[in-house]
């Protein structure tokens, strides 16, 4: 028979009493009143902050956006199919933030920075707020270094600098994404981290972009943040801020970054959907009153940091889609007024076979030649003016039957210059190649060729120059100026190659 030892039992009880710690936990909770269309109305949550993350009983997370006197409007970051009326909600005390680290390079993520490429988790020891304040006036310095896109028309006439915000605007299917991805490809070896944010795109389009970047080895320095068309509106709205937070992580570590938002029209539509469902009053085109702030607080985060902060930079290329070339619609005018210039892509030019379909006349860069190396300024100075005059003359020439010789020559030169700006997709050019191409056209060396021969001649000239005059590239990359020596080498190469080319064509 087992004997009961009172002293042993009392010592166990005493030990348990000594170990007991009384912990009072105050949890800010609420009850779901109504749920549907990605929105939940919650009663309670008295001390919740605007933008705070809240967690539902079944695990879905949401953001408290509307704080009203008798309920809280929460937007859901998931489908919320298991949330029921009367289920409990608790405030987390946290504002939306994401983990950040170098491990994100080469990966495809969603708006919550979770990998969606099936290559496992990413370890990160640091985190950043998705919405963080933009650098102030003292923290910045003016833009002065070029960010080469590899596209002649842009680098010569609408130059982009590190820390600039340049809008890419145009109708659907005019090559906006192609301009952005070519810019990413051209950053290879330039020590620039790229972030591509796809908002509301088809999953097949995003897969196409990722494949193109992988094939050319560009994913090594690129992060893709994707929320496709079937994602909840909340996540489409958050995706650009997630991309900006990742780019900022590198910017504040003295690195140069490039971020592409493809596209902000879809983000504005997702935000409009959320706002209307939250019963916020609609404004112009049914967008809410703060849609300008939606984009301005995002784009102001792009900056060129001061010397004290390490001179890192974040260059933003937002994309906006227009309907039949209407630049005066609400979202396009908003983003044009926030950015430092725009690249306008025209459907008419695209259909006429001029690709990239950049309308040079109404595209501008408000940073201008400050974002060009001296060699490019020397060569491309007159190019934009000549092309603008050519466009005017061409329109006039349609009505005039007999033109004088000077006008005919100017038209012929203009046609060749336009041909010179055509470029294949995924074939960005180095600065030295661009300088050689522009110099050849602007100085009349192409005038003796047929318009149809220009592109073939220029491709062969660039190869010939690389092979036979490697000093040209060395001079441009080391001195950043178009020296008399470089000019002599280039002229020599052009003369030699024109003879060779004409012999080949006649043969």
Curated annotation (Swiss-Prot):
Look up the record and report any one GO term of the cellular component aspect: proton-transporting ATP synthase complex
Source organism superkingdom = Eukaryota
Q: What are the record keywords, sorted?
A: ATP synthesis, ATP-binding, CF(1), Chloroplast, Hydrogen ion transport, Ion transport, Membrane, Nucleotide-binding, Plastid, Thylakoid, Translocase, Transport
Q: Spell out the InterPro entries in the cross-references.
A: ATP_synth_asu-like_sf, ATP_synth_asu_C, ATP_synth_asu_C_sf, ATP_synth_F1_a_nt-bd_dom, ATP_synth_F1_asu, ATPase_a/bsu_AS, ATPase_F1/V1/A1_a/bsu_N, ATPase_F1/V1/A1_a/bsu_N_sf
Site annotation Required for activity: residues: 363
Enzyme category, top tier: translocase
So what does this thing catalyse?
ATP + H2O + 4 H(+)(in) = ADP + phosphate + 5 H(+)(out)
Per UniProt, what is one GO molecular function of this protein?
A: proton-transporting ATP synthase activity, rotational mechanism
Membrane topology is: Peripheral membrane protein
Where does this one sit in the cell? Plastid, Chloroplast thylakoid membrane
Q: What is its EC number?
A: 7.1.2.2
**TM regions (residue ranges):** none
Write out the residues that bind ATP.
Answer: 170-177
Subunit comment:
F-type ATPases have 2 components, CF(1) - the catalytic core - and CF(0) - the membrane proton channel. CF(1) has five subunits: alpha(3), beta(3), gamma(1), delta(1), epsilon(1). CF(0) has four main subunits: a, b, b' and c.
Q: Which family would the database say this protein is a member of?
A: Belongs to the ATPase alpha/beta chains family.
What the protein does comes down to:
Produces ATP from ADP in the presence of a proton gradient across the membrane. The alpha chain is a regulatory subunit.
> What name does the UniProt record give this protein?
ATP synthase subunit alpha, chloroplastic
Q: Which organism is it from?
A: Lemna minor (Common duckweed)
Instruction: State which gene encodes it.
Output: atpA
């Amino acid at each position: 028979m087992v004997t009961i030892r009172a002293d042993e039992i009392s010592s166990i009880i005493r030990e348990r009493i000594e170990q007991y710690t009384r912990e009072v936990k105050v949890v800010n909770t609420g009850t779901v009143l109504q749920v549907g269309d990605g929105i939940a109305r919650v009663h309670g949550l008295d001390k919740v902050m605007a933008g705070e993350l809240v967690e539902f009983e079944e695990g879905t997370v949401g953001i408290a956006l509307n704080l009203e006197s008798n309920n809280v409007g929460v937007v859901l970051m998931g489908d919320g199919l298991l949330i029921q009326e009367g289920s409990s909600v608790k405030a987390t005390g946290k504002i939306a933030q994401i983990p950040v680290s170098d491990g994100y390079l080469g990966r495809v993520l969603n708006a919550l920075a979770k990998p969606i490429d099936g290559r496992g988790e990413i370890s990160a020891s640091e985190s950043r707020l998705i919405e963080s304040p933009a650098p102030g006036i003292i923290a910045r310095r003016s833009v002065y270094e070029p960010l080469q896109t590899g596209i002649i028309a842009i680098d010569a006439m609408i130059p982009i600098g590190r820390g600039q915000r340049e809008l890419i605007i145009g109708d659907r299917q005019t090559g906006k994404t192609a301009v952005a991805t070519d810019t990413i490809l051209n950053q290879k070896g330039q020590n620039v981290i790229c972030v591509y944010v796809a908002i509301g795109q088809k999953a097949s389009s995003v897969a196409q972009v990722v494949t193109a970047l992988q094939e050319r080895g560009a994913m090594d320095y690129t992060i893709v943040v994707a929320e496709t068309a079937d994602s909840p509106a909340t996540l489409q709205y958050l995706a650009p801020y997630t991309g900006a937070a990742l780019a900022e992580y590198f910017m504040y570590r003295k690195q140069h970054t490039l971020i592409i938002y493809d596209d902000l029209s879809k983000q504005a539509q997702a935000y409009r959907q959320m706002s209307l469902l939250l019963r916020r009053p609609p404004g112009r085109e049914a967008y809410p009153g703060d849609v300008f702030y939606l984009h301005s607080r995002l784009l102001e985060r792009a900056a060129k940091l001061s010397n004290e902060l390490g001179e890192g930079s974040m260059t933003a290329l937002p994309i906006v889609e227009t309907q039949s070339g209407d630049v005066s619609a609400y979202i396009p005018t908003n983003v044009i007024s926030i950015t430092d210039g725009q690249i306008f892509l025209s459907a008419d030019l695209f259909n006429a076979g001029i690709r990239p379909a950049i309308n040079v006349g109404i595209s501008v860069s408000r940073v201008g030649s400050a974002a060009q190396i001296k060699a490019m300024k020397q060569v491309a100075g007159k190019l934009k003016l000549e092309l603008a005059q050519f466009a005017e003359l061409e329109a006039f020439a349609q009505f005039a039957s007999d033109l004088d010789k000077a006008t005919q020559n100017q038209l012929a030169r203009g046609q060749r210059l336009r041909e010179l700006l055509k470029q294949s997709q995924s074939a960005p050019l180095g600065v030295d190649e661009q300088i050689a191409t522009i110099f050849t056209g602007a100085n009349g060396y192409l005038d003796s060729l047929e318009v149809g021969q220009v592109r073939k001649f220029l491709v062969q000239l660039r190869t010939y120059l690389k092979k036979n005059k490697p000093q040209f590239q060395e001079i441009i990359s080391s001195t950043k100026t178009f020296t008399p020596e470089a000019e002599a080498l280039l002229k020599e190469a052009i003369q030699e190659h024109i003879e060779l080319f004409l012999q080949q064509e006649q043969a």
